A protein has these predicted regions:
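Alpha-helical interface subdomain recognition
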Residues: 1-73
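Glycine-rich flavin
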Residues: 41, 45-49, 54-154
Length: 154
């Protein structure tokens, strides 16, 4: 997996083409991350290098100004090659997209957060939804993967 220097998103960025390039690279490592039960740091670095962590930030604050539907396509394409990368990335993305939406539609005071995400390339994390303390599940290793039985209240 190659790691280039970080680039700022440019107006007119072809996010889907960039996602396809990253997906092709992370596909080879997906099984490794799953079998080692390790964080998808390589995929995260590639996403950061291409400016994806600021993609949902409005352009006027230094972000990539990607739309919601296009970001969903990006996450879908990543998920087809490495579900763990797509899931971890979506946990950041939904927080930034929500802050951008609230700024645009509710005039919420999220400008400071959005500017910092863009300027500092911050990665945000979330708890994963509603009452995660009552979530439970079991993952049993099987030949060729895992059998997962779980309950999550959204």
């Amino acid at each position: 997996m190659s790691v280039d220097t970080m680039t700022k998103p440019k107006a007119g960025t072809d996010w889907l083409a960039a996602a396809d390039r990253i997906a092709a690279e992370i596909a080879a490592d997906a099984a490794h991350y799953d079998s080692e039960e390790s964080f998808v740091s390589g995929g995260y670095q590639l996403l950061k290098n291409e400016g994806f962590f600021r993609a949902c930030v409005p352009a006027e604050f230094g972000g990539g100004d990607i739309g919601y539907a296009e970001m969903c396509q990006v996450i879908r394409r990543l998920g087809a090659c490495c579900g763990s990368t797509a899931l971890a990335f979506s946990m950041h993305t939904h927080l930034v997209a929500t802050a951008a939406w609230r700024w645009r539609h509710q005039k919420a005071p999220t400008v400071g957060l959005l500017k910092r995400v863009a300027a500092e390339d911050l990665v945000l994390v979330s708890s994963g939804g509603s009452d995660w303390l009552k979530s439970a599940g079991v993952a049993m290793k099987t030949e060729g993967g895992f059998l997962i039985s779980a309950r999550k209240i959204f």
